[in-house]
From Swiss-Prot:
Entry protein name: Probable proteasome subunit alpha type-5
PROSITE patterns xref list: PROTEASOME_ALPHA_1, PROTEASOME_ALPHA_2
Subunit structure and binding partners: The 26S proteasome consists of a 20S proteasome core and two 19S regulatory subunits. The 20S proteasome core is composed of 28 subunits that are arranged in four stacked rings, resulting in a barrel-shaped structure. The two end rings are each formed by seven alpha subunits, and the two central rings are each formed by seven beta subunits. The catalytic chamber with the active sites is on the inside of the barrel.
Family named by the database record: Belongs to the peptidase T1A family.
Main location: cytoplasm
UniProt GO BP: proteasome-mediated ubiquitin-dependent protein catabolic process
Gene for this chain: pup2
Subcellular location: Cytoplasm; Nucleus
Naturally occurring in which organism (per UniProt): Schizosaccharomyces pombe (strain 972 / ATCC 24843)
Amino acid sequence: MFMTRSEYDRGVNTFSPEGRLFQVEYAIEAIKLGSTAIGVKTKDAVVLGVEKRLTSPLMESHSVEKLFEIDSHIGCAISGLTADARTIIEHARVQTQNHRFTYDEPQGIESTTQSICDLALRFGEGEDGEERIMSRPFGVALLIAGIDEHGPQLYHSEPSGTYFRYEAKAIGSGSEPAKSELVKEFHKDMTLEEAEVLILKVLRQVMEEKLDSKNVQLAKVTAEGGFHIYNDEEMADAVAREQQRMD
């Protein structure tokens, strides 16, 4: 007896006759409703930038978290469901600390990304005794930035458990126009400051609200300073530099 489309929708571990997992596809679509996040890799660093949607004038901007530290040399930007992201990030933090404790070295960026994607597949109904983290796919995508022995690296992970390495990448609601601008403006010899300006320029173009230092946030990963989320003063300076380029 054949299953209907709605039954394939409900079965998170069941492929349709066309070879599709609808719940995973829906999770990917949910990310397209999320706030825009952008990552740019330079020769010496990786810069992340995110849109912070303030749904009320009474909301404190510091409470809207879209950038997270995983380890001293790794951080990420998220788009999608923040609650899902916290589960993934907590898992990644434990994995990186276990690796550091066991091997007395920082975990590689790709290994960290792999552990995140392994977790992304642990949804639905498992076998007896098999732990499942979620009853559905995670509704969040990550831009994972870090520096290891291979230099600066930028990865994108999605709910399907797929990940790819990028030189520049945008996710979220403004990802399509942002990607077009990144393709046009990105070059491999960019400095860190140029990457900051490019990210803010692209965010300014795709955001519905006027960009200022309160509704965007930047972070960077460098060999000297590790992962660092910009404070209010640094954000104001970065936005001012981008504004000067426009003028």
